Amino acid sequence: MDLAAAAEPGAGSQHPEVRDEVAEKCQKLFLDFLEEFQGSDGEIKYLQFAEELIRPERNTLVVSFADLEQFNQQLSTTIQEEFYRVYPYLCRALKTFVKDRKEIPFAKDFYVAFQDLPTRHKIRELTSSRIGLLTRISGQVVRTHPVHPELVSGTFLCLDCQTVIKDVEQQFKYTQPNICRNPVCANRKRFLLDTNKSRFVDFQKVRIQETQAELPRGSIPRSLEVILRAEAVESAQAGDRCDFTGALIVVPDVSKLSTPGARAETNSRVSGADGYETEGIRGLRALGVRDLSYRLVFLACHVAPTNPRFGGKELRDEEQTAESIKNQMTVKEWEKVFEMSQDKNLYHNLCTSLFPTIHGNDEVKRGVLLMLFGGVPKTTGEGTSLRGDINVCIVGDPSTAKSQFLKHVDEFSPRAVYTSGKASSAAGLTAAVVRDEESHEFVIEAGALMLADNGVCCIDEFDKMDMRDQVAIHEAMEQQTISITKAGVKATLNARTSILAAANPVSGHYDRSKSLKQNINLSAPIMSRFDLFFILVDECNEVTDYAIARRIVDLHSRIEESIDRVYSLDDIRRYLLFARQFKPKISKESEDFIVEQYKRLRQRDGSGVTKSSWRITVRQLESMIRLSESMARMHCCDEVQPKHVKEAFRLLNKSIIRVETPDVNLDQEEEIQMETDEGQGGVNGHADSPAPVNRFNGSSEDASQETVSKPSLRLGFAEYCRISNLIVLHLRKMEEEEDESALKRSELVNWYLKEIESEIDSEEELINKKTIIEKVVHRLTHYDHVLIELTQAGLKGSSEGSESYEEDPYLVVNPNYLLED
């Protein structure tokens, strides 16, 4: 790769070739380094790597800069300070080294790439003072261009004298010879490029951007174009956080040079008196000097993940095995991972270590932790992909630490993107099609979901997104792909990401009397794509409020002492990377248990008690499977055990069934009856006996008026479930003890009142409790169908007996009813 402005062979014999003595000395010393430097085993370290370069697809040798410093400090300093100048000579030294040992094609070029540079620079630190120096920079790839061939050294044919002019350097734009090399030919502009004899190399342009971690507060992230060549192409995808090793260079800004005004100026030259041009035609070069149309780009020779020891570019790396991950760790680090895997209290310790500054919300912590471990992605025989990533939505009142969860995950995960729903468009979340400034072709620019591929996408204010933007992520959440068909570009891109979303209730406060769907502004398809929903309600509780206040004050006053971590974040990252390599299988026992739990969820969904809960679908079954696999992964198990399924069911049950707990209206039937009476205009009322009027206060004593003003009797959902469970357990116990035992309604009421005898202090309270239990029994019988009144079939005795039977019927439990845990 001829990159430096190496001297061009002279145009004829009158121009001797200029030699660069410093670069030639570097070439000789670098060749000595390749031939003499030995590894820890005493063998020549780079000999085997160089022999692999004879394969057609290989042409780049990766050299450790630390080895170069160890071999010759002066050589390493010269290469670092004069990299762009000496780089072509280093490539020639490599070609000589390979040529001496193997037969290689004459026209094949070889390239050198450096890694393990001691210092890393930010994009913001790249100024003109670093032009030409060997530098390592880091950033996140946001746009990739397609790979195409680049002309690096052209062979031209003079159209006047047919002279062949070889090795004309191309300075990042199409460059013709200044003049024909034939001394008797004065041709300056009529040349033809011979593509068969010219040298081309693979060329790709990517755009990188500063990461959020290194961005100064309140600053807009800066971006830089990176040029990749040869083996470095296609080594970085949109969303990757990578280190690029190479040199900062100056190239002509072709996009500005190709504007209509610039093209017109290239043709306007000052002509002499005889019609000859007084200035030689130098094409765009002269214009570039005049207008200073140049820009900085980074020419990279090596690309590597920013943090390879923690999974590098992503949490999921399919090629890694447990053994390869172990080899990346030190002995002490591996012992720590092994110790964590044997921890009996690992589940709790990981939660507290990951979110040390958030008090309470243990269920949310567990759900987010399982999301980080993730399930096992699968592919069916027909090629259909089943996602393994877990999506979590946190819904809650303001100041319940929703955004803190998102921020913690964003900082912890090696590949996470944090965005706000209101400030994001559909293209910003998925992908945008933009026009390239130079080639004017359409290229794809990655959105948040693509940047978070194989990571976590944290979306705050999820409910504030426009409906059309919500629709854009339907496909990404379930199929984990993004399909684009616009501006002549048709592509299906990967978006294998877990989504952690935070949303506020519609009215600013979660209303327990309404369903989840009524509380948040999300469509049913989006809701069904979330595996876990967590509801955070800001309730007034003296004990909880004191604990939270104490925690916050401790954080402000003694931040170091108040943060108590069992494991450091680096320990958790290492353990997470190791545990994600496990692919647990579902055992037969666990399979039956999962089916049984899903049947319970479905039957409970259809019952009257939880009728307001959102629908339980097959997606919730898949959610249970993913959560079970995640639990097995966390404990480094190769098989999903029933205890893992039980915890997954508990979390799912917490987020689905307990999501809505409205108070139960025990006077519902009476209110409906009153509305019916009002609608009939008093037809069934007592018209013959008008209500007396109190003369002193002028108020009517009509019973119906009294009923209207009286508030309806309501019972908390948890209390209602407790009473119904007590009744069901008692009735079933009676059925088991005696074959023909059935309690009358009055006997059941008396039994309950006797059970709570210690809680009753007055006659008024006794009447109140009796009214409540009677209404609960009535609702369980006529609305929820938990209890069944025995019919009168076969008991047609005396009329007196039948009347008493209907007033006080026998009650039994519905055989299809499943008792809640």
From Swiss-Prot:
GO terms for cellular component: CMG complex; cytosol; MCM complex; nucleus. Residues 696-708 have a biased composition (Polar residues). Pfam families: MCM (PF00493), MCM6_C (PF18263), MCM_lid (PF17855), MCM_N (PF14551), MCM_OB (PF17207). Residues 346-553 form the MCM domain. The modification N-acetylmethionine is found at M1. SMART domains: MCM. Its main location: nucleus. CDD domains: MCM6 (cd17757). ADP binds at R619, E622. Belongs to the MCM family. Component of the MCM2-7 complex. The complex forms a toroidal hexameric ring with the proposed subunit order MCM2-MCM6-MCM4-MCM7-MCM3-MCM5. Component of the CMG helicase complex, a hexameric ring of related MCM2-7 subunits stabilized by CDC45 and the tetrameric GINS complex. May interact with MCM10. Interacts with TIPIN. Interacts with CDT1. Interacts with MCMBP. Interacts with DDI2. Acts as a component of the MCM2-7 complex (MCM complex) which is the replicative helicase essential for 'once per cell cycle' DNA replication initiation and elongation in eukaryotic cells. Core component of CDC45-MCM-GINS (CMG) helicase, the molecular machine that unwinds template DNA during replication, and around which the replisome is built. Early fractionation of eukaryotic MCM proteins yielded a variety of dimeric, trimeric and tetrameric complexes with unclear biological significance. Specifically a MCM467 subcomplex is shown to have in vitro helicase activity which is inhibited by the MCM2 subunit. The MCM2-7 hexamer is the proposed physiological active complex. This is DNA replication licensing factor MCM6. It comes from Mus musculus. The gene is Mcm6.
